[in-house]
């Protein structure tokens, strides 16, 4: 598999299939590991406000390595970068299994994830082009969300049975992702021979940030995806505390089932976006973004399981329809200006900065004793207002 190959632009080429399988297994491990590690924190009597800290150390790795991972993705064959990154995730999951501090192990998984993300999205533009890129993003998002669906549930269910079994399953998933990466064709590096001087790399990354921010379309995409993923991660942790308060259920599995409803909805929304939205009609996704916040607000007031399931699925549908076109827009415009790997690295910086900020505010709210239902109401209202403001700004510019 070491030879270079010409790109086969089919959506179902051998390389694309390998990317999708590797992405599924890697994302499965990510999501199962989150809920397995949360169960470990509960079992070891960590305070409730420490739960979002777990995700904050994960996204902190993204932010710390943001200036460098884009160049890594563009300087080497992206399939090999993905394999190395999944190896780091495997090491992190295994370290938690063997009793190393879960925050340290999860940080290592975050380093692997930071290296993985620019490569996994950047390779799509090398395996397919043009009008197929939105569809390729739809496949990637669908496989990711299917992994979120199954991984989240598996992590919670296995953790209710035995936490160590859940952690071992995560390590096994990462091992499978490493194997799948072997079957991704070794495409030529997008931008080989770049300087590895850390100061120059940081300066180059900041230049990429500036270039993308000055372009109205890429700035619009960066802000939209950052708000979405920041809110999405915060919602996952809100559910962990909301379920016992609103529904009176205290197991590890129920929050994962509710997260699964969001995942199912995103698959549906991503498919709809691939059919109904093009790079020229991206603004069609904006009403869906506003509705996410409105439905989160309504959801926070529920006390029955069935309405909660339905509303979370609706949130997912709106989310998939909202984020897939924005991702495709950034990849297409970014590939032409700063390179796909750098564009995704800048996107990761924005998204993870938003996650860090939102999780920090959420953790602080929990720490000072604000009830989870008012937190959810305020969270939904602020998100709807933020997307409304973004849409108004986009229409004016």
Swiss-Prot record:
It is a multi-pass membrane protein. SUPFAM superfamilies: MFS general substrate transporter. One of its GO terms (biological process) is glycerophospholipid metabolic process. InterPro entries: LysoPLipid__transptr_LplT, MFS, MFS_trans_sf. Residues 39-52, 112-144, 188-226, 278-280, 326-343, 388-397 are cytoplasmic. GO terms for cellular component: plasma membrane. It is found in: Cell inner membrane. Keywords: Cell inner membrane, Cell membrane, Lipid transport, Membrane, Transmembrane, Transmembrane helix, Transport. Residues 1-17, 74-90, 166, 248-256, 302-304, 365-366 are periplasmic. The chain crosses the membrane at residues 18-38, 53-73, 91-111, 145-165, 167-187, 227-247, 257-277, 281-301, 305-325, 344-364, 367-387. Belongs to the major facilitator superfamily. LplT (TC 2.A.1.42) family. It comes from Escherichia coli (strain K12). GO terms for molecular function: lysophospholipid:sodium symporter activity. This is Lysophospholipid transporter LplT. It comes from the Bacteria. The keyword Transmembrane helix applies. Catalyzes the facilitated diffusion of 2-acyl-glycero-3-phosphoethanolamine (2-acyl-GPE) into the cell.
């Amino acid at each position: 598999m070491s030879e270079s190959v010409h790109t086969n632009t089919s959506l179902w080429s051998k390389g694309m299939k390998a990317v999708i399988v590797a992405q599924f297994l890697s994302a499965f491990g990510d999501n199962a590991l989150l809920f397995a590690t949360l169960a470990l924190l509960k079992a070891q009597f960590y305070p409730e406000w420490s739960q979002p800290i777990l995700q904050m150390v994960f996204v902190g790795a993204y932010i710390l390595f943001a200036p460098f991972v884009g160049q890594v993705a563009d300087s080497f064959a992206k399939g090999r970068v993905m394999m190395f990154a999944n190896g780091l995730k495997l090491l992190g999951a295994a370290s938690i299994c063997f009793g190393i501090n879960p925050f340290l192990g999860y940080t290592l998984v975050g380093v692997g994830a930071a290296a993985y993300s620019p490569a996994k999205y950047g390779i799509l533009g090398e395996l397919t082009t043009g009008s197929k890129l939105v569809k390729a993003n739809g496949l990637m998002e669908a496989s990711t969300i299917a992994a979120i669906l199954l991984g989240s549930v598996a992590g919670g269910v296995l953790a209710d049975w035995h936490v160590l079994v859940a952690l071992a399953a995560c390590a096994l998933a990462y091992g499978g992702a490493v194997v799948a990466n072997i079957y991704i064709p070794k495409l030529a590096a997008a931008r080989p021979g770049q300087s590895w001087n850390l100061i120059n790399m940081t300066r180059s990354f900041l230049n990429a940030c500036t270039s993308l921010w000055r372009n109205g379309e890429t700035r619009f995409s960066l802000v939209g995806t950052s708000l979405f993923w920041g809110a999405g991660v915060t919602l996952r942790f809100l559910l962990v505390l909301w379920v016992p308060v609103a529904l009176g259920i205290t197991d590890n599995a129920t929050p994962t089932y509710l997260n699964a409803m969001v995942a199912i909805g995103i698959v549906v929304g991503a498919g709809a976006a691939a059919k109904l939205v093009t790079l020229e009609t991206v603004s069609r996704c904006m009403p869906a973004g506003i509705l996410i916040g409105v439905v989160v607000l309504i959801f926070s007031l529920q006390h029955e399981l069935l309405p909660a399931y339905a509303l979370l699925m609706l949130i997912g549908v709106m989310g998939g329809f909202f984020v897939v076109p924005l991702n495709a827009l950034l990849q297409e415009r970014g590939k032409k200006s700063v390179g796909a790997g750098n564009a995704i690295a800048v996107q990761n910086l924005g998204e993870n900065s938003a996650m860090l900020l939102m999780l920090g505010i959420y953790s602080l709210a929990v720490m000072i004793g604000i009830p989870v239902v008012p937190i959810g109401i305020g969270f939904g209202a602020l998100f709807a207002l933020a997307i409304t403001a973004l849409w108004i700004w986009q229409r004016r510019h």
